[in-house]
C-alpha cells in the first residue's frame, strides 16, 4: 500500500523562522500520516475529537492563559501561573567585559562554563565548559555533600584554566551565574529559597534554605574565591543569552523534557511589584506548565495524571512537553489493543510498561515516509515486541500525530498569550517592530511536526500581519552563556 501526500515536502530551517505576511500554501512538514480527517477506527475517531484544537478553541486557551498571567502579576497565587519575579532588571548589552562563570544544575548532570567577554567589538573572546555527573547517592544525600561536591568540581575546573585564554582582573573575585532549575522563591537577583526538590532529587536539610548561600559557603570551604552574582532558571538564561546577540529578543521558551517560558515585562504592569520605581522592565518567569484551565483532557490524560508524581498539577506541561507525549500515546495504544484487534488478539506485555514509548520514538515514526512504513514497524518490534501489519502501523502514526498536533498547537497558544501581553503594553508588532522568541529544548529542536503545528497555531491566532513581525529563533545551549552574562550585568565591580 502506498501513502499519498497532499503537498510537496518542505522542512523549515531550524535556525530561525520568520512568518510571512501572506498566507502560506504547499508548506507542510514531512509526515507519514496527518490527523486532518477522522479515522475509520471508532476509538481513534473519538480520541481525535477529544484532542481537537480548532482555532476558536485555541483562542479561548490563549485568552485564559493571558487572564492567568494578569492574575499572577496582580498578587502572589492569583492564578495558575506563578508569574515569578526574577529580579533581572537589566539584560546584557554587549558592553560586558571580563571573566565570568556559569553553573547549571537541573538534573543528573551539572555543567560549568567560563566565559571571557571582550565588550561590544570582540564579544566572547573564549569559553570552556565541562559536564559532570551527579551520583544517585548525592541526589538523596545532604546539602553539604551535594554542594561540597559541586564546589570541588568548580575548583578543579578553575584550576585547569589556560592563563593565555582566561584572565581575571587583579583585585576581583570570580563571579558566577547560577542556573538552578528547581522551584525557588527568589528574593533578590542573588538569593532564593528552595520550595521543593523535583527530578529525582531529595537532598535533606535544604527546603526553605537559601540555595545561593549553600553554594557560596561550599565554595569558600573549598578555598574557591568565587561568589554567585545571579540566580536564574534555564528560561531566563536562554532569554539573556539570546538577547546578547539580538536586542529584539523578548521571550524565552523551553520546550524539551519539561517546559517553561519567561518574557520581558513592563514594571508598571506588575501590581505585586512593591518597589519605589515602576519604570523600566524586568523578566517574569511564568512557570506556565502549571496552567490547568479549559485544556482538552482525555481519559488517557486523566489516567496518566493520576499516576504521576504531582497529580492535578502542571496539566499544561503534561500535554505539551517531551516527558509525557510518548506516555500518552502508549496509553491510547494499550486501550486500542484491549478493545480491538490493533495488534492481533493480544496486547503486548511491554505496552503495559510505563514509559515504554518515548517521544523520540514518536518522532521517528512520524518521519517515516516509506511505502510500507517499515521504520514504524521496526520501532514497534524493537520496543514493544509486536509485529504490526500495515493497517496497525498507520493507526499508530495517526495516534502519534493526534497527540503531537495537540501539544504543538497548545504550545503555540501559550506563546501567543505572551506575545499579546507584550503587544498590549508596547505596541511593538503593530508598529512594525520585530519581536523575537528564543527557543531551546530537544522537543522543539528535533521534532519538525511539533514545530510546524506550533507555528501554524501562532499564525492562526495572531493573523498574518502581526505574525509577520514575529521571529522564532532556535538558540541551542545559550542558557549557560546567559547565566554568565547576567553575572557580568549584576557584577559588584
From Swiss-Prot:
A GO term from the CC aspect:
chloroplast
Record: residues binding D-glucose: 198-199, 233-234, 260, 287, 317
Q: Which Pfam families match?
A: Hexokinase_1 (PF00349), Hexokinase_2 (PF03727)
Q: Which SUPFAM superfamilies match?
A: Actin-like ATPase domain (SSF53067)
Q: What is the lineage of its organism?
A: Eukaryota, Viridiplantae, Streptophyta, Embryophyta, Tracheophyta
Q: Does the keyword field hold Nucleotide-binding?
A: yes
Leading EC class: transferase
The record's similarity note reads: Belongs to the hexokinase family.
Region annotation (Hexokinase small subdomain) maps to 93-232
Q: What is this protein called?
A: Hexokinase-like 1 protein
Q: What does this protein do?
A: Fructose and glucose phosphorylating enzyme.
Q: In which pathway does it act?
A: Carbohydrate metabolism; hexose metabolism; Carbohydrate degradation; glycolysis; D-glyceraldehyde 3-phosphate and glycerone phosphate from D-glucose: step 1/4
